[in-house]
Amino acid sequence: MNDKLVEQYEELKVLIESLQVDLVKNASGNKSAGVRTRKALRSVKKIASDLVKSSLTADKAQ
């Protein structure tokens, strides 16, 4: 179960790092980058939620 937690955390970390380019472009006025950023943030929210659920499940299993 711990492997799944680490995998989900790494996925979350990569996604957040990939947001940086579009976030900077959006701050400079690029509206398309803003759309991509918001879409990626929704994915971040989902992955973070899944990570919390997996963490709780792992705690209960111990």
Located regions from the model:
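Intrinsically disordered, compositionally biased charged tails
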Residues: 1, 60-62
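N-terminal acidic leader/helix
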Residues: 1-22
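A charge-rich, low-complexity, intrinsically flexible signal that marks solvent-exposed coils, linkers
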Residues: 15, 33, 55-56, 60
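A structural signal for well-ordered alpha-helices, especially hydrophobic packing surfaces
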Residues: 16, 20-23, 45-48, 52-55
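Short, surface-exposed loop/turn segments at secondary-structure junctions
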Residues: 27-35
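Short, charged, amphipathic alpha-helical segments
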Residues: 34-42
